[in-house]
Amino acid sequence: VGMSAVGLKPIVEVQFADYIWPGLNQLFTEVSRSCYLSNGKWPVSMILRVPIGAYGSGGPYHSSSVESVITNIRGIKIVYPSNGADLKGLMKASYYDPNPVVILEHKGLYWSKIPGTKTATSVEPSEDYILPLGKAWVLQEIWKQEDVETLTIVTYGMGVHWAYNASGELDMRDQVEIIDLRTLFPLDEATIMTSVKKTGKCLVVTEEPSNNSFALALAGKIQENCFQYLDAPVMT
């Protein structure tokens, strides 16, 4: 907070998400609110990198998912890339954004360490490659089909690879539309709702515990906005 107040751009890492709790009070009461409480005099422009998710034998100390807590802090932006190219593009956008940004990075996607995540490793984009915050990516797009069961999967991070691999294994690539959120806040609601209205069904895939989760909140939002277009309840 102090570094940002004097014009610097701090980039901080919490290693790992399980260790974010001691700093949560400062993130909630100072980082996210400083601009508002000072009437714009002391905006906090910073990046907080957080390796996250289950991988290897980390057990209770290196495997948590904390997005359900972080997304309830107003005043910060949150990104969760699914591959190396997106990480670069989103990090550059975060650097130029005047707001505090939390970047959640799944440990299992570093160097594609988990089987089935080869596409997480990508050729480094150009120096000026930037992805706008708040814009989702339709990774696997399908056309509207009247006589075939279709589905929208909304996901991010590791879930993108689970969804893509599963649709291939089930030979349903032309029936399943996959949306990679990229940014959890601000949320690209327009892309989500457009897809769900087209397919009539939706599955929200995340790694986090389901109770009182980001996934349940998103499912409720989709259900509320797309109710008349849905053929079945939104599942998580």
Task: Enumerate the language-model features and the residues they cover.
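Short acidic, glycine/serine/threonine-rich loops at helix termini
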Residues: 1, 22-25, 57-63, 89-92, ...
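Acidic, glycine-rich active-site loops and adjacent beta-strand->loop/helix elements
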Residues: 14-30, 50-55, 84, 107-109, ...
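Conserved thiamine diphosphate
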Residues: 37-97
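Thiamine diphosphate
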Residues: 1-47, 107-108, 112-236
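General beta-strand structural signal in soluble alpha/beta enzymes
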Residues: 12, 48-50, 78-82, 102-105, ...
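Helix-enriched interaction subdomains in cytosolic or periplasmic regions
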Residues: 75-78, 85-125
